[in-house]
């Protein structure tokens, strides 16, 4: 009986140490961000934002779960094939995607659970510190020329027809 109790205590100790290792926080994160945003609204239906980061931690934590918050909306962050590479993406209607800087706040599992708890309790989520933040500069989307090429071609055609008809009338007169 005593052997079973000590074996159970050993298993509990092993499980608790494993859970502490897997949920280890990233200390002093160093990031290398890159991002892409849609610039042409003529050929797309929504503005897409893609943020890729390369993350290294001072304590060498790898493959941690990350979550992103953009303007109060949360998105899961996917891990890349390479160690320490992560990506998050989202899309907005062209009218909603204003030109300017978007702050993408990244959270680990612990701070993300605090964020979700604050949301459930209708508390201010801006007081929860992110693991790190990436600023995405979106310059807006180009909606094409003010006058479509078809209308411009038709107008030029009408002007040429008028000039040709006028010249013909002057020659025949």
Curated annotation (Swiss-Prot):
Disulfide bonds join 26-57. Residues 166-173 are cytoplasmic. It is a single-pass type I membrane protein. Residues 1-23 form the signal peptide. There is a cross-link at residue 73 (Glycyl lysine isopeptide (Lys-Gly) (interchain with G-Cter in ubiquitin)). It is found in: Endoplasmic reticulum membrane. The chain crosses the membrane at residues 145-165. It holds the Pfam family TRAP-delta. One of its GO terms (cellular component) is endoplasmic reticulum. Residues 24-144 are lumenal. Keywords: Congenital disorder of glycosylation, Disulfide bond, Endoplasmic reticulum, Isopeptide bond, Membrane, Signal, Transmembrane, Transmembrane helix, Ubl conjugation. InterPro entries: TRAP-delta. It is linked to Congenital disorder of glycosylation 1Y: A form of congenital disorder of glycosylation, a multisystem disorder caused by a defect in glycoprotein biosynthesis and characterized by under-glycosylated serum glycoproteins. Congenital disorders of glycosylation result in a wide variety of clinical features, such as defects in the nervous system development, psychomotor retardation, dysmorphic features, hypotonia, coagulation disorders, and immunodeficiency. TRAP proteins are part of a complex whose function is to bind calcium to the ER membrane and thereby regulate the retention of ER resident proteins. Belongs to the TRAP-delta family. Heterotetramer of TRAP-alpha, TRAP-beta, TRAP-delta and TRAP-gamma. This is Translocon-associated protein subunit delta. The gene is SSR4.
């Amino acid at each position: 009986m005593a052997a079973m109790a000590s074996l159970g205590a050993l298993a509990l100790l092993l499980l608790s140490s494993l859970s502490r290792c897997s949920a280890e926080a990233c200390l002093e994160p160093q990031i290398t961000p890159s991002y892409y945003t849609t610039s042409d609204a003529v050929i797309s239906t929504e503005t897409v934002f893609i943020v890729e980061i390369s993350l290294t931690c001072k304590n060498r934590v790898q493959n941690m779960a990350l979550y992103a918050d953009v303007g109060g909306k949360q998105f899961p962050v996917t891990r890349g094939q390479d160690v320490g590479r992560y990506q998050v993406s989202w899309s907005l209607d062209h009218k909603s995607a204003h030109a300017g800087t978007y702050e993408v706040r990244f959270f680990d599992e612990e701070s993300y659970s605090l964020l979700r708890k604050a949301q459930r309790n209708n508390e201010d989520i801006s007081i929860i510190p992110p693991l790190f933040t990436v600023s995405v500069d979106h310059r807006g989307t180009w909606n094409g020329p003010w006058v479509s090429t078809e209308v411009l071609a038709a107008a030029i055609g009408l002007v040429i027809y008028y000039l040709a008809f006028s010249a013909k009338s002057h020659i025949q007169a």
